[in-house]
Every structure is written in C-alpha cells, then in structure tokens.
Amino acid sequence: MSATESCAKNVQYRVDHLLSAVENELQAGSEKGDPTEKELKVSLEERDLWTRFKELTNEMIVTKNGRRMFPVLKVSMSGLDPNAMYTVLLDFVAADNHRWKYVNGEWVPGGKPEPQAPSCVYIHPDSPNFGAHWMKDPVSFSKVKLTNKMNGGGQIMLNSLHKYEPRIHIVRVGGTQRMITSHSFPETQFIAVTAYQNEEITALKIKHNPFAKAFLDAKERNDYKDILDEGIDSQHSNFSQLGTWLIPNGGSLCSPNPHTQFGAPLSLSSPHGCERYSSLRNHRSAPYPSPYTHRNNSPNNLADNSSACLSMLQSHDNWSTLQMPAHTGMLPMSHSTGTPPPSSQYPSLWSVSNSAITPVSQSGGITNGISSQYLLGSTPHYSSLSHAVPSPSTGSPLYEHGAQTEIAENQYDVTAHSRLSSTWTPVAPPSV
C-alpha cells in the first residue's frame, strides 16, 4: 500500500463519524415527517399550565430592557419535509380592541387601544434548519424578550395594558417554492403590564418558574426578618420597666428599684446571666464583643429578680435611707491596719450630721475607700485617714443604742446604721 492510499484511508476514517452524526440527526425527526407537508401540525406544550394562567387572565411583564416570558412558549411540530429547510418566526397580534385596567381584583376594559406599534418579528435562533431538526424536539422560544421601548436587537415591543396573542409562523426556504403557515393558541393570550396586578398570577408564576425561586427565598427571608424584629421589639417592651442598667466592675447587674435602696446583687459571673444584654437598649451592634456570656434563659428571670437587684442612681439625688445588704459579695474592702474580724467587709461607716462627716473606724483607716461606682459620681475618694476620730456620745443616731462595740461581732447589723444626706462636705483628717 502506497503512502497516498494510506493517507486517503486515514482521512476517510476521520470523516466517517461526522457523516454518521449528520445522518443520525436527520433520521431523528424523519419519522414525524411528510414530504408532501399535507399533515403539518403544530401543538402547544404545557397546555394545562397555560390554561391555568388563562383562567386568571395571564400577565406578562414588559420592561425597557426586555423581560422573558413565563410560561415559556413551546410547540411541537410534525408533518414537515425532513430534508427541506425551514425558518420559524414569532410575532404578537392584538387579541381585542380594548385597553385594559385592573379594578377591584379583576380586569375590565378601560378605553380605546393605543395605535399598534410597528410589527416586530422574532426569528428563532436555530433558523434556518431542516424539517427533521424542528420535529426532533419541542421548539422553545425561551430567549424572546418583551419590551415597551423601541430598542431593536430582536426584542418584541408591546403596549402596556393591552392584550396580545402569540403567533408562530413556519416558512420554507432554500427553494423556489415558498410556503408559509401560521399557528396561534388562545391559551397563550396575556395582558402586557409593567408590574403584576393579580397576586394569584404572581403566586402561580413563583410556584412554577424555577428562576423565580430566588425571589421566593428573598421574600421568605424578609418575612423571617420581620418576625425577628417583632420578637426583639417585644423583648424590649418587656424590659422597659427595668430602667437603666448598671454593671459595676465587680460583675453585678443592678437596676433601679423603688422599694429598697440596696438589695442582693445579681452576679454575672455565673453563665446563667442576662440574656442578650447587648441588645436590650438598641439594635446597633457593639463595637467590641461583649464579655458576658449569651444564654437562652427566659428574660422574665430578670424581671422577677429585679426587686433583689442593687438600686443605684435614681432620677433624684435625695437618698432618704442607706441600708447595707446582708450579702458577702457586696462592696469588697481591703484593710490596712487594725484587728477587725477577717470576715468584716464594712470597716468604716460615715455618719453625716449638720454638714459634718464623722468617720467611725474599727481598723484605723480605709485603704481604697468606697468606689465611686457605687456612690454618687462626684464623691471624692478618702484614700486614708491617719486616726480614727471618736464619735460624740450623743447626737449621732448610729450610737444611740451602743452599736459601736457590737459591729465587730455582728458585721451585717443593718438596724443601727445612720441616714445619709445628699450633701457631702469633704473633711480633712484631724491633726494629732
């Protein structure tokens, strides 16, 4: 075998599979063909779905940039000459002589129609093609776009609020004989709109259109967000009676309480703390992460325990009484000198009378004083006193019953404490 014959054989092998593919393509729709074209038939796909839209008066969106149709117009063809070439076209004609309007949940005629726009014809992108190709699979017009502006580019211009009916035309090409057939389907009539008017049409399109699932998911997310917002608003209303919250460095959560001045503090060191503290006051996120643990406890626990919380700054500065709580975690103090009991947490009590402050000390001094976070914001620090000034024997309600000698033994005696005035006068330590 010569080199020329070998090369020709290789070329034949290379094109055989190509010719076979073409023949298979032609044979795919040939069984539906009719060279005489006497039994040409075009049938609508998804007729039941179109009928459901027809019963509700179908609507199609038209936009400046063009919007695709749904349901998509699809037809099946039979009776074409498998070996002849055809071009398939689509146009839209007015279904009536009315301009429509949507009133009280239904479409009613609303006047005379506008002049018809110049006729626009959409040519199927597979055109021209053999009859076998058109008959092999349903012909879909999924790429046609409806617009209300004259843009060109193969888009179909329609007048809004007018009813239209699509028509499909089949034209035989490639020969001297031209044959044109037209087919229309009443189920495909629709009213062109810039926005859906009938909510049932919207729901039906969302249900059956796979490309509308994103719109459905977005709507569900918005509904869920609204539910969350309503829940947060309700939670805010439940906490409105608790007033302003104050968290000291010690980790106690306190709220104003009209019944008692000092109660047991609500500790946040335990994981069973306040639920969502950062979202109680507003919806804005904090610039720094909250150090408190978020739990799913019911917010009612805070409301129920509000009477036991520490009451701090109220709307007025007049403190009528000051009672020390019987709580071992309240206002921890450190002792520098003296020999008080190691469990004592209140080494110094201040008695205010006639604008004078009389320090009563068991240990001889205060190391750190009472933090200004628990008292008035302008309260000065009394870092240290060199001496304990003896209190007068009379005139001070703190020592009316001789409670001075009992403090060391009863560190939580709250019955003999004095009342504090809103006016505090700084006093210097007495000289020796």
Swiss-Prot record:
The record places the DNA-binding region at 49-217
* Matches recorded under PROSITE patterns: TBOX_1, TBOX_2, TBOX_3
Can you name a GO cellular component term?
nucleus
InterPro entries for the chain: p53-like_TF_DNA-bd_sf, T-box_DNA-bd, T-box_sf, TF_Brachyury, TF_T-box, TF_T-box_CS
**Subunit field text:** When not bound to DNA, exists as a monomer. Binds DNA as a dimer.
Gene name per UniProt: tbxt
CDD domains with a match to the protein in the record: T-box_TBXT_TBX19-like
**Which organism is the protein's source?**
Xenopus laevis
The yes or no answer to whether the keyword GTP-binding is present is no
The free-text function statement in the UniProt record for this protein reads: Involved in the transcriptional regulation of genes required for mesoderm formation and differentiation. Binds to the palindromic T site 5'-TTCACACCTAGGTGTGAA-3' DNA sequence. Causes dorsal mesodermal differentiation of animal cap ectoderm when co-expressed with wnt8 and noggin. None of these molecules causes dorsal mesoderm formation when expressed alone. Establishes the left/right axis at early gastrula stage by directly up-regulating mesodermal expression of zic3.
Supply the name of the protein.
Answer: T-box transcription factor T
Q: Which Pfam families match?
A: T-box
Instruction: Supply the induction statement.
Output: By the natural signal and in response to the mesoderm-inducing factors activin A, basic FGF/bFGF, derriere, nodal/nr-1, nodal2/nr-2 and nodal4/nr-4.
* Segments of skewed composition (Polar residues): 293-306
Q: In which tissues is it expressed?
A: Expressed in presumptive mesodermal cells around the blastopore, and then in the notochord.
Molecular function terms, GO-annotated: DNA-binding transcription factor activity, RNA polymerase II-specific; RNA polymerase II cis-regulatory region sequence-specific DNA binding; RNA polymerase II-specific DNA-binding transcription factor binding
Compartment annotation: Nucleus
